[in-house]
């Protein structure tokens, strides 16, 4: 998993409340057994004018010019600004996969659905909770300035604006540690690979009838 320390990027304002996971990545794209390739279909039903299906050549599909991510001023955005209850609806880890593979590194909103919130951390995507008033200010700034950027400093736990304002945010110490070091669940486990191998060797010495090959 890619480390997250300090990130500066263009902000895209998604000015809708209760954006659910089916809007983030529609159900027909969940059939894949792979973990990659979801970025082109993030917000598929809002982003394109036709109905999307797996395997389509998205470069040939008609774009919805009114959708925020299709507007030239927000191209290359890596910080998503959203409204309350972002990521609600059915549980699907494909939602943070799609957002991350689109290019987002952080999402700022007044609140998130719990399961989506947790899934973001597991996939290197930083969900940041600010107050509704703070989010309103950021929406106003994003609309007012073309190419508006924010800096997210995870170590300092602040969101910085170009004019020097800082918005502190909370994050659990363990989650912060994992993001700063680029550790997902597998990465955390592999840090203890030597101890795991030692335990397995000792167990097999005591219980040789369980003689399976060691992993790694």
UniProtKB/Swiss-Prot annotation:
Gene Ontology molecular-function annotations: 3-isopropylmalate dehydratase activity
Substrates-to-products reaction catalysed: (2R,3S)-3-isopropylmalate = (2S)-2-isopropylmalate
Superkingdom classification of source: Bacteria
GO terms classed as biological process: L-leucine biosynthetic process
GO cellular component: 3-isopropylmalate dehydratase complex
The entry's keywords: Amino-acid biosynthesis, Branched-chain amino acid biosynthesis, Leucine biosynthesis, Lyase
Enzyme Commission code: 4.2.1.33
Main EC class the enzyme belongs to: lyase
InterPro entries, per database record: 3-IsopropMal_deHydase_ssu, Aconitase/3IPM_dehydase_swvl, AconitaseA/IPMdHydase_ssu_swvl, IPMI_Swivel, LeuD
Pfam annotation, one family: Aconitase_C
Pathway in which this enzyme or protein is active: Amino-acid biosynthesis; L-leucine biosynthesis; L-leucine from 3-methyl-2-oxobutanoate: step 2/4
Family according to the record: Belongs to the LeuD family. LeuD type 1 subfamily.
Assembly and oligomerization: Heterodimer of LeuC and LeuD.
Record function comment: Catalyzes the isomerization between 2-isopropylmalate and 3-isopropylmalate, via the formation of 2-isopropylmaleate.
HAMAP family to which the protein is assigned, alphabetical: LeuD_type1
Name of the protein in question: 3-isopropylmalate dehydratase small subunit
Organism expressing this protein natively: Burkholderia ambifaria (strain MC40-6)
Lineage: Bacteria, Pseudomonadati, Pseudomonadota, Betaproteobacteria, Burkholderiales
